[in-house]
Amino acid sequence: MKFGHYLCLSLAFSGILKCYSQGTLPVPVNLQATYIKGTRTTNGAPGKNYWQNRADYNIKVNFDPKSRLLSGTVAIDYVNNSPDTLKEVDFKLYPNLYKKGSIRSMPVLPEDIGDGVQISQMSINQQHQNESQWAIDGTNMTVKTPGVLPKQTVHFDITYSYILNKTSHIRTGQVDSGAFFIAYFFPRIAVYDDIDGWNQQHYTGVQEFYNDFCHFNAEITVPGNYEVWATGNLKNAGEIYSSTIAGRIAEAAKNDGVTDVITGQDLKDGNITQNKVANTWKFEADSVTDLAFAISNHYLWKASSLVVDPKSGRRSRVDAVFNANHKDYFAVINYARKTVETMSYQFPKWPYPYPHETVFDGLDQMEYPMMVNDNPLEKAEDAIELTDHEIFHTMFPFYMGTNETKYAWMDEGWATIGEWLISSVIDPKITDTFAIEGYEGSAGTENDPPIMTLSTLLEGGAYETNSYPKPGLGYLYIKDMLGDTLFNKGLHYYITQWHGKHPMPFDFFNCMNTGSGVNLNWFWKSWFFDNGIPDQSIGKVSIVQKQYTVSIFNNGTKAVPVDLVVFYSDGSTENIHKSIACWKDGNKKVTLSFTAKKRVQQLVLGGPFDADANRADNIWVAK
């Protein structure tokens, strides 16, 4: 694209901004183009020309636990809703993270490195393709096509296989000799969107995923002594399970209490499935971004359900599937159920959108649509915080369809605030401050770029703080300033406009502004776009009789709430709070006044969620 086109585009965009809210955010040129094309709007809603592509997947695979060979076919009907003719279709082969020669940002043991996904046959619209029609580069595969016209559907049939990793468990792989979590297991078409065209980012292990909303039918064949749990609804439970187990599943789906679906005695008796040789498990999921499954021949299964939408009476089932030797997992069903309940009724106060949430005892700390792969933990507090964090991802990214690869903060930041808020609901003794201390330690260093830095450019500590605590705190501070009613109006407007679609960061910022009716650009720019640190201090303290006047200074550039804790000599405390609104005008000082109820011993500035790069100047001691 030549400079002249950029100039015209920028002039056109400046015209749009003249009628936009006071104070605008710095929008990159490639994102400005979405406003010109009418695919997105400056009030946050999708534009009149918004489009996204979709596909129907029919997956049939066999998995052999002994050899770890997964083999099968995938049939795809891909709908091109874009205005472009697609001369090629790009695929993702995520198992190629373990392929020889692939680029990786996470370590993989030599014994797990192999030949990757083997494509033995491919056809397009029932026309056989030879190998010259496709090219594989790491986790990407490009397939030449005759040209898929706008509004046209193209059909792919692919026969493939690969060996699942035994160790080096990066979100998928063998858990133990009789348990496996199997994700990203089929060739899938990459996202083609109005911003980047084809998503050609390689999956290297750190940055996560970006997938279209699709319809899935999956048939998964495993030995007869294994059970399967997966994204979506099991369509043939009555054909596979014994009548006893099938009855317990039905009971769990309609009862608030916990049902022991598979017990230790059931495992001993071996009467869980009807066919003891092999079973084909059939799952269906609609309008989801991915499908994952897990299998085991020795796991217990606890299940419960609850009404997640009081208007319709719709229920969702919650599962904990686990190794009996992992004692912490016996309580995970309670943590998971309470998380789904809290999400539906308190935060984000949106009915849990899927038919089930299954927490599987694995070797990672990872989310998938309707599934979680969580390692066991010794402390109940840690198990609670991990469980609610991963389940919260149901909303972000899965319900909302965000690009995790480029904008990790758009899902991990939400899972972080979700964890902070829900953990104390599950156990009021918990004050969950996950990752805040790490941010305070790195704030202002070379390892602390702005949140809006693309996640693809980050790794290590910079990736972690930009994805988790920094955006989580930003959301928390806005929630505190707006109050729950206005905050929910903004957040629900964003969810309503964009669930099932692909929002970019500016869609979120603009939706929050529009939905809440408050221009928050001053904070978005400071917290998400600018460099700087959070750093407050206690300045002058004036005392006239029992009247205290305290100067609080913002020595940094990031707006943080003011929480002054007054410690009295009898051990009691009083908290004085101001939201980030007190810094809105760019002032560097605010003044707090209070009347002491008793003799003051000391003043301490900063609560557990008030990030501060230097807490040494946050204490004033009475003389």
Model-predicted regions and their roles:
Residues 101-112, 161-216, 237, 306, ...:
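Glycine/proline-rich low-complexity spacer/linker segments in large multi-domain proteins
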Residues 86-129, 183, 221-226, 567-578:
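Solvent-exposed beta-hairpin/edge-strand motifs
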Residues 25-90:
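Early extracytoplasmic/domain-onset interaction patches
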